[in-house]
């Protein structure tokens, strides 16, 4: 009697389920680009510096998606850029970028070119200040090591061949020697892994979309870290400082999202000695970086010499209690839309633990001019705005140094001033390192204010706050 063939374990295929699955895939092809485009447009408004890396990330995810034809990729790319442009257009219509070099720095024929001129004014080339091998490891160590382990594990899984310990040790040794000897260690630390990652992406192009997306995000992060070793966005400082820390923030986030699932997926299929070794390497890198935070806190607090806490104005309460009480009074007793006139200061400057522009900073009340350097930095792309800043700077200088019956009433009425704050800085000046307000005339200013109908509404120590007298 013939043996009975067992029933298949696979359940019969439900056509409705197939239709729903196909519909889900179809919706996913359109929803991802549309949502990515909307977020990209919002990013252009909120953090323009992050747009290049976000665009590269979205593009790599599209290119890495399985079973996507060139035509489909182009269509999806257009679906990303179209809503991005639509969302950002109202903002861009009135936006004057603060980055980029003035056109006068380029030869006239280059500055007039529509695309090349803009690119040359916007992107600078790093000729020095490249990160050392140690700096790269200190900054990116744990995420880099975890990403490399995930890459090796994925490489091993995709090639279905064990990774020979001798080959792996030789590769690590070569990378260490080359990184220490190279003038641009990032080419070794991130360039070589990027080449391996590109190969894995090509080999894994039929893998699950989620895994391909994680690989694409990791590739985007490493590409960005490598790119800032050669290029930077030109700004008022003329170096890559702002570009580096803004790109690093985004690259850390991308790696933190991409590395864990890649690592877990690869290690789940790694049955040899390598799995234990990989876990040990990742664990060691995390433990090696763990002391950074407590050691930094210990250093910056001078061994917890005194209680600091989370109160950002505690130092002001201790060093200048009269200023602190006056600021507290303004914050509690004035309308949120009040305009307080104080001496304009220089960026990051202090006089005896008293920061410049401390009143507007600590109260949230508007003033007519903030830190001089930052005011210029934010508006350097507009000649009209720079002229406005220069006018305000000159008026403030005359207001506090040469107060007269013409200048003082004009400034108060033009800018809708609600209160005039005359404190320590308005009496003694802003210090030798700030060229603004060297010889204030606080007593003469008080006399003029009272002559035009203003009176002290608050007095404490070195602080006097003036406001217009309300006549009944």
Q: What are these model-predicted stretches?
A:
Residues 50-60, 188-191:
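Transmembrane-embedded, aromatic-rich helix segments that form part
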Residues 76, 80-357, 426-427:
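Transmembrane helical bundles and short interhelical boundary loops of multi-pass, membrane-embedded
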Residues 33-46, 173-179:
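Membrane-interface alpha helices of multi-pass inner-membrane proteins
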Residues 34, 38, 55-59, 286:
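Residue-level signature of the transmembrane alpha-helical core
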């Amino acid at each position: 009697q013939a043996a009975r063939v067992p029933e298949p374990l696979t359940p019969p295929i439900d056509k409705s389920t197939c239709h729903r699955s196909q519909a889900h895939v179809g919706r996913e092809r359109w929803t991802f680009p549309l949502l990515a485009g909307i977020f990209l447009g919002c990013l252009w408004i909120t953090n323009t510096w992050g747009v290049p890396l976000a665009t590269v990330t979205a593009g790599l995810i599209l290119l890495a998606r399985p079973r996507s034809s060139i035509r489909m990729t182009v269509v999806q790319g257009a679906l990303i850029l179209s809503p991005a442009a639509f969302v950002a257009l109202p903002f861009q219509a009135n936006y004057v970028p603060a980055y980029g070099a003035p056109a006068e720095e380029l030869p006239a024929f280059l500055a007039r070119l529509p695309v090349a001129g803009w690119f040359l004014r916007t992107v600078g080339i790093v000729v020095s200040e490249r990160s050392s091998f140690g700096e790269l490891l200190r900054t990116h160590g744990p995420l880099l090591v975890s990403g490399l382990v995930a890459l090796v594990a994925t490489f091993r899984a995709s090639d279905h061949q064990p990774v020979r310990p001798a080959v792996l040790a030789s590769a690590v040794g070569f990378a260490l020697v080359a990184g220490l000897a190279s003038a641009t260690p990032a080419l070794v630390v991130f360039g070589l892994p990027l080449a391996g990652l590109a190969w894995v992406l090509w080999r894994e192009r039929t893998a699950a979309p989620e895994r391909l997306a994680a690989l694409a995000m990791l590739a985007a992060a490493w590409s960005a870290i490598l790119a800032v070793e050669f290029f930077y966005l030109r700004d008022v400082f003329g170096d890559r400082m702002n570009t580096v820390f803004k790109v690093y923030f985004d690259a850390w986030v991308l790696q933190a999202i991409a590395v864990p699932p890649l690592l877990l997926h690869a290690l789940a299929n790694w049955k040899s000695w390598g799995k234990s070794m990989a876990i040990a390497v990742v664990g060691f890198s995390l433990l090696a970086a763990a002391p950074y935070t407590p050691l930094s806190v210990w250093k910056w607090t001078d061994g917890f010499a005194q209680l600091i806490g989370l109160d950002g104005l505690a130092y002001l309460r201790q060093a200048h209690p009269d200023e602190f009480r006056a600021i507290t009074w303004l914050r509690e007793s004035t309308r949120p839309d009040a305009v307080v006139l104080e001496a304009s200061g220089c960026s990051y400057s202090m006089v005896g633990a008293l920061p410049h522009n401390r009143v507007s900073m600590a109260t949230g009340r508007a003033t007519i001019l903030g830190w001089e350097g930052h005011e210029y930095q934010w508006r350097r792309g507009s000649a009209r705005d720079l002229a406005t800043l220069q006018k305000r700077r000159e008026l403030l200088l005359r207001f506090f140094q040469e107060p007269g019956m013409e200048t003082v009433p004009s400034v108060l009425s033009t800018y809708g001033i609600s209160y005039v704050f005359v404190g320590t800085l308005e009496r003694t000046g802003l210090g030798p390192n700030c060229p603004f307000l060297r010889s204030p005339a606080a007593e003469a200013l008080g006399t003029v204010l009272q002559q035009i109908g203003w009176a002290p509404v608050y007095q404490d120590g070195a602080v006097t706050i003036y406001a217009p007298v309300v006549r009944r």
